[in-house]
Amino acid sequence: MTNSSSTSTSSTTGGSLLLLCEEEESWAGRRIPVSLLYSGLAIGGTLANGMVIYLVSSFRKLQTTSNAFIVNGCAADLSVCALWMPQEAVLGLLPTGSAEPPADWDGAGGSYRLLRGGLLGLGLTVSLLSHCLVALNRYLLITRAPATYQALYQRRHTAGMLALSWALALGLVLLLPPWAPRPGAAPPRVHYPALLAAAALLAQTALLLHCYLGIVRRVRVSVKRVSVLNFHLLHQLPGCAAAAAAFPGAQHAPGPGGAAHPAQAQPLPPALHPRRAQRRLSGLSVLLLCCVFLLATQPLVWVSLASGFSLPVPWGVQAASWLLCCALSALNPLLYTWRNEEFRRSVRSVLPGVGDAAAAAVAATAVPAVSQAQLGTRAAGQHW
């Protein structure tokens, strides 16, 4: 009887992908706060991701290449927030021993566990790939010539990248065994799916850091050029706004036609020099953006490494690492859009009260939006 009960408990643990562990009765009370957190993330993430998808599909000005990758990530995050998180929250609120369908691993209960695990793996994989596509798109926009960018991100090429992200994620979900070892059997000395997940997260982090830190190194001239990135903190930093307002025609980057307009150039005081302000502002925004990714993904890297080598990991560390990674799915829309001027205008047209409140909060420090004509190229806002 003891062995049977232990096997059932272990099966429940493996079925929840180590998110709501039930290895001991003492953990039962701690599953309720975790379930409530998943419920909040599910509601907030579903609304935020759904709003971004609706805005981009409804407003022509938002239908750019960069936003296509953002919407792709929002669609993947929507599957996690709307389909997987509610199930995990409900299973955590059920009494111990009844959090799974009454069946063996090879029966209906096992199929249900694999389906939930596959749904989570598909959504998170596509979401992380979309983050990489957004970072690479912005890096090439800043560091390559407009003609090169336009040739690479043609409409059919962009559609191919989006389809490839889903195909790659689906192939990994179908071909690889579950992240957690199969319950009821002796754990292997090395569990390769967990190690592969850790390696993939490390590779994604390295790519993001390379792209965003490369942007900081390469962009040195114009505040307008940096504003193409739509970093979520750029429009609220006072140094950039003051420099742009006091010296609107000073030292802008030359357009594709050649030289800048020397008649408009004015000497700037050291405190408002655009290069110095731009380096400080872009560096801060990139640093915060990278910190969000590191905080959300690196704890899961270490948990995956420990699980891959069959090392014991405390329940609290497991739950916290998965919650942080899943929270990235709920915060993804805000991470890219909440300081974007075009998104704010679209939100004001859909939700006047919310949009007006957001506009009033940033009115004192907002930088005017930069049109494609001012940039001198369609690459920054290339439509689908």
Swiss-Prot record:
Outcome after substituting residue 287 to A: Reduced G(i)-coupling activity
Effect ascribed to mutating residue 322 to A/I/L/V: Abolishes the responsiveness to synthetic agonist 2-PCCA
Membrane-related topology note: Multi-pass membrane protein
PROSITE patterns: G_PROTEIN_RECEP_F1_2 (PS50262)
GO terms of biological process kind: adenylate cyclase-modulating G protein-coupled receptor signaling pathway; cellular response to light stimulus; G protein-coupled receptor signaling pathway; locomotory behavior; motor learning; neuromuscular process controlling balance; neuronal action potential; phototransduction
Glycosylation, residue list: 3
Top-level taxon of the source organism: Eukaryota
Keyword terms, alphabetized: Cell membrane, Cell projection, Cytoplasm, G-protein coupled receptor, Glycoprotein, Intellectual disability, Membrane, Nucleus, Receptor, Transducer, Transmembrane, Transmembrane helix
Effect of residue 216 to A/F/L: Reduced G(i)-coupling activity
All ranges on the Cytoplasmic side of the membrane: 57-73, 137-158, 217-285, 332-384
Tissue expression as described in the entry: Expressed predominantly in the striatum.
Transmembrane domains' residue ranges: 36-56, 74-94, 117-136, 159-179, 196-216, 286-306, 311-331
Effect of residue 121 to F/L/W: Reduced G(i)-coupling activity
Record note on what altering residue 117 to F/L/W does: Reduced G(i)-coupling activity
Cell compartment(s), UniProt: Cell membrane; Cell projection, Cilium membrane; Cytoplasm; Nucleus
Known outcome of mutating residue 209 to A: Reduced G(i)-coupling activity
Effect seen on changing residue 84 to A/I/L/V: Abolishes the responsiveness to synthetic agonist 2-PCCA
Effect of residue 283 to V: Retains G(i)-protein-coupled signaling activity. Abolishes the responsiveness to synthetic agonist 2-PCCA
One GO cellular component term: cytoplasm
GO MF annotations in UniProt: beta2-adrenergic receptor activity; cytoskeletal motor activity; G protein-coupled photoreceptor activity
Stretches in topological domain Extracellular: 1-35, 95-116, 180-195, 307-310
Clinical disorder: Chorea, childhood-onset, with psychomotor retardation: An autosomal recessive neurodevelopmental disorder characterized by abnormal involuntary movements, marked speech delay, intellectual disability and learning difficulties.
Its biological purpose: Orphan G protein-coupled receptor implicated in a large repertoire of behavioral responses that engage motor activities, spatial learning, and emotional processing. May play a role in the regulation of cognitive and motor function. Couples with the heterotrimeric G protein complex of the G(i) subfamily, consisting of GNAI1, GNB1 and GNG2, thereby acting through a G(i)-mediated pathway. Plays a role in the attenuation of D1 dopamine receptor (D1R)-mediated cAMP response in ciliated cells. In non-ciliated cells, involved in the inhibition of the beta-2 adrenergic receptor (B2AR) response.
Family: Belongs to the G-protein coupled receptor 1 family.
Protein name, entry field: G protein-coupled receptor 88
Species for this entry: Homo sapiens
